[in-house]
Amino acid sequence: SFTEYDVLNTSSVVAKIGIHFSELDDQIEQAKQLDPQIIFLAYGMNDVTKTNGDVDKFIKDYSDVIKKIQKAMPDAHIFVNAVFPVQESAVEKEPALANIADYNEKLEAMCEKKQIGYIDNSDIIEDEYYEEDGIHFKANFYPIWAEKMAEVATL
């Protein structure tokens, strides 16, 4: 959505809607061609539902992706965004989304262990930014999120 809402240039974003960890090899190769100094990752929502509450599997899969990225782009600095919380209406439809806090706790610990950046975006989230589905964000959220990532990475 960063490019869709003209927040970031398409030449600096590698993204695919609805993708799972197991499908990231093409995106990693695309990113490698860009030779980035900094990589921001924002994965998880689809894999939270796919792992059905298995936080350890989620962390293992995320860790494997980071290993691939580090191998492909060893000089890049990696920052992992926390999985965004969802509104209660979304949890009612998809109960696996109820324990996102557990995922983020282990995600932060994984980042610490790997000595990579972790971005807790909880301070920028407001109910008004959510779309009706209670999961996705409206266009006005993305500039705020981009600013937060830039701030954390000291860009």
Model-identified regions with their sequence ranges:
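A non-catalytic structural micro-motif
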Residues: M73-V80, M149
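Charged helix-capping and loop-helix junction motifs
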Residues: V55-V65, A96-Y103
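Structural recognition of the beta-strand scaffold that forms the well-ordered cores
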Residues: I38-A42, D47, H77-A82, G117-D120
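Helix C-cap/helix->beta junction micro-motif
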Residues: A72-M73, K114
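Conserved SGNH/GDSL esterase-like catalytic core that processes O-acyl groups on lipids
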Residues: S1-K60
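N-terminal cationic-hydrophobic initiation segments that often serve targeting/anchoring roles
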Residues: K32, Q70-K71
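Short amphipathic alpha-helical segments and helix-helix/interface helices
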Residues: I28, I66, N104-E108
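Catalytic His-Asp segment of secreted/periplasmic serine-dependent ester chemistry enzymes
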Residues: P85-L155
